[in-house]
């Protein structure tokens, strides 16, 4: 998924992608590889005409009046096309001036927004300002060779310098000739100081550069996956080889994490302050390594062809490599650690559609009614009303969709109401609701919701971890039920649980997925032995569990005999959703 998730943003992304494809932005980048000098790309005037340089600039300064949320959509598309030109440094400069405001914004924003002025930014260097002049090396300046306006960090401040008197620009050979950085030295250059603006400049630069990194990462991921599907070796597509699969999967994971971080950071720009600093640091920490990883793995998946001059892989590798020092992920991560130690955390808010308000009235009224009840009475009301686990089917939940669930979270948080935390018990009980008989549901569900009984999940074995169907614990038919023998391991909370949900092998003579049955085991029954495993922390949260002729009555078999794999897979799915929603760990009485 790209940064664009709304209909309007997806339309903008599509327009940007189509434009860059039609104007052959990647070809324009390639043309600069051996060009002696950097020039504006041939599509620059058309790009300016689309108004993208002013997307985020207030209307009174010649922009469109949108925000960073729209800007990063375009920047991601530019990254995917490895587009040349000073777009990125120009919009970093204009975003900073727009955030600071004042007379300097009135002076410079119109030119930056209409493309008559190109911007450059310097985040490092050693520049000092004495009165109204700037002195020192600005270091590596992105866009310095094409710019008319420079924003350079100077201590905690930012110096705004018009290229001209007192400014020396040298463009040495670049790792990425398609978008070059320059060495800029200031020697008494006239400067306007933006007091305390360095933080704003760095934050906004991180968000915008990270958006470009996401575009690079996503394009490299898609190129690698497409090539792996079509490249045949040893009589099959290389996409069928595990090592290649893992490369592509790692690329997807890195890209999606970075995408989410940039999306969130762009939203944080409206808040500014620590919220923006925190989110921008997260984006930089994730996006720079993602682009670097994906550019390198794209080269590896393509093999020898990717290290030829004619292939485009090295264009992406060059751009990703130059983004590493600009985004400085290690520095961002260290700052993020400091912010966390200071108690800064990201405020989580989501803009909900209009239909949320009708739901909100009902939820708020319920929350107000139960907020002053005792914890036990409050839990009972939550269970009876379905609010304890609102996404569960009725009558145990409310069959709530995503919008209703978010409204419930918001209103309960505002009222100080904590829903019970069921953890493993929750996802096991949901499976029972889905697959158990009415009698079994009546026996097991409500006591678990009341937190009278804690459950554990008895799936993993010494030889069946990720291969959950490779279990050897066996159940042998006896009068009235089954005798279970075998071992489970890594069973979280087995030492605390009253009941366990287990996979056992009831038919060893069929393929492994077909001979599995799911059963409920009383953890205090004769023949059950739980041995806690000591962890690196010194504590014990998971266990070995041994079964020695443990009797399980027929009434405690869940689903069809030999048909338990379907039930087990449902449980694993419920586990993933629960953990992803923050419902991990163990349920204990009074937990919330």
What are these regions (language model features)?
Residues 2, 73, 92, 304-368, ...:
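Glycine-rich phosphate/cofactor-binding loops in nucleotide/flavin-utilizing enzymes
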Residues 2-14, 79-80, 169-256, 348-354, ...:
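Glycine-rich beta->alpha junctions and the first turn(s) of the following alpha-helix
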Residues 27-35, 233, 252-286, 300-302:
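C-terminal helix-coil-helix/basic helical segment that borders enzyme active sites and/or dimer interfaces
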Residues 114-125, 152, 451-459:
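A short, Trp-centered hydrophobic/proline-enriched beta-strand micro-motif
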Residues 122, 137-168, 172, 485-533, ...:
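A short core secondary-structure module
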Residues 127-129, 473-476:
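A structural signal for short hydrophobic beta-strand segments in well-ordered beta-sheet cores
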Residues 464-467, 481-482, 491:
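Hydrophobic, small-residue-rich alpha-helical packing segments that form membrane-like cores
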